[in-house]
């Protein structure tokens, strides 16, 4: 949903194809994940396919300059890049946890997801797919971080994010001005299942953040939202307090995990162990998330000294300083 929303908002012509459907003519992706973007050649085939939403967004910015989702202020753009990763690599853990750690949520997804690519799937095959989906996804919980011990950490983080969004959306439509950025679409993408699909987190959101639920519906298709060239971005110094509050949340959860995970990957360790939200957090090391931290540090290194100082001023006191520490 994240990338489809980006394409819609940016008015980029595209065909959206359900993977595994009879219309799926995409070649194999480099790794079996979604979304996959494919660029057609002159003969109707594909000259290139690409996975991973963050590099996809960067590539689209190069190919299509209109209705950009990258702020003109480099310091703001960097903070936006960080919050995009917070959603993609931390909030995703809560999404996975709520869906596959609760019986009601698990059963709903197990019954419905097999029908996504084929509404006419025979009942016996749907039943087999139901069991396969549940067994596979529940079996991956520990790899994602959704253990019984970590569950309360993920749930409290989700609740605080909802509370922050409820306060933020009382005054602002987006995180960095009057137009959406990378992080807006990333939070939308991870929140969509929790706000509109899975029963347990949806009930929490109805109680705590009704504004976030309706914002999420907006974000799905912002093709109607008007923007004027490169106008509408705030400077790093003018980032709303509620946007900064998301950085504070990241500083108590996402940031210590990302740093510990990168260290565990570098050391070849079998487990990540760190303190998040005042509680011990453990999970299997994740090589991709170590790469994400390296990307953040590369982006920071590419800023001018002046813009690095401005970023430091925003991150100072949030706990996210460790992301760019050398």
Regions found by a protein language model. Name each.
Residues 93-96, 100, 171-174, 200, ...:
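Intrinsically disordered or highly flexible coil/loop and linker segments, enriched in small
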Residues 141-177:
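Short N-terminal edge-element motif at the start of the domain
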Residues 188-280:
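Active-site/pore-lining binding-face segments in mid-to-C-terminal subdomains
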Residues 75-83, 153-160, 164, 211-214:
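A non-catalytic, amphipathic alpha-helix used as a structural packing/dimerization or gating element
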Residues 1-124, 175, 195, 253-326:
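GST-like domain detector, emphasizing the conserved glutathione-binding G-site
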Residues 88, 162-166, 220:
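Structural signal for well-ordered, non-membrane alpha-helices
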Residues 175-195:
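GST superfamily/GST-like fold recognition
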Residues 105-155:
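Divalent-metal (Mg2+/Mn2+/Ca2+)-assisted nucleotide/phosphate chemistry catalytic cores
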